[in-house]
């Protein structure tokens, strides 16, 4: 069973607002779109990890079938959010970890990643025209190692750099561009 972990706790200093509260010019919420992508992509359960702007973001998610948690030490960076999200999940063989600041990642990307393989040993990530990106698919057996190496804003990056994993090409579906500024 693949679960979804959506990391949306960032303060968004370069954005000028918490990333969980960012909207496209047409009003589309990045938070809601990303949570929907995990659901539509085949995750059986989705947990959204909040931090900055948590009260407003949680209200936006009130009608969405997701679990919402607030990372207690979200200011420590992505690693704190990842730790909170994976720690919340008691079941499931693997988790698709997605970030709020990837506005063009769709359910099709998530589905393709899940279709590449699931299970407790899976380790895969989306790539865009050969460049590794997000989301990342982490089998449960990898969670302790990922969390042991996660510090500050470095989530699974160091673990993935030292462990064989599958790159799942998704460049035909999205760019995977991480948007840190609206300028």
Predicted ranges, named:
Residues 102, 134-137, 176-177:
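A residue-level structural signature of the nucleotidyltransferase/glycosyltransferase Rossmann-like core
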Residues 109, 134, 142, 152-156, ...:
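Internal, well-ordered alpha-helical segments in soluble enzyme and binding-protein domains
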Residues 56-59, 145, 178:
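Phosphate- and divalent-cation-binding pockets in alpha/beta enzyme and binding domains
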């Amino acid at each position: 069973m693949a679960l979804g972990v959506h990391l949306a706790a960032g303060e968004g200093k370069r954005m000028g607002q918490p990333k969980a509260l960012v909207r496209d010019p047409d009003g589309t919420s990045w938070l809601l779109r990303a949570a929907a992508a995990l659901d539509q992509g085949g995750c059986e359960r989705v947990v959204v990890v909040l931090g900055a702007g948590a009260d407003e973001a949680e209200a936006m998610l009130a009608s969405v079938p997701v679990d919402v948690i607030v990372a207690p030490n979200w200011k420590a960076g992505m690693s704190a959010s990842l730790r909170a999200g994976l720690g919340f999940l008691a079941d499931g063989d693997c988790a698709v970890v997605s970030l709020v600041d990837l506005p063009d990642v769709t359910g099709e990307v998530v589905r393709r990643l899940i279709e590449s393989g699931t299970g407790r040993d899976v380790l895969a990530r989306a790539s865009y025209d050969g460049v590794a990106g997000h989301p990342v698919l982490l089998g449960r057996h990898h969670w302790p190692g990922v969390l042991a190496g996660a510090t500050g804003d470095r989530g699974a990056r160091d673990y993935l750099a030292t462990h064989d994993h599958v790159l799942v090409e998704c460049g035909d579906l999205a760019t995977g561009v991480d948007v840190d500024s609206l300028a």
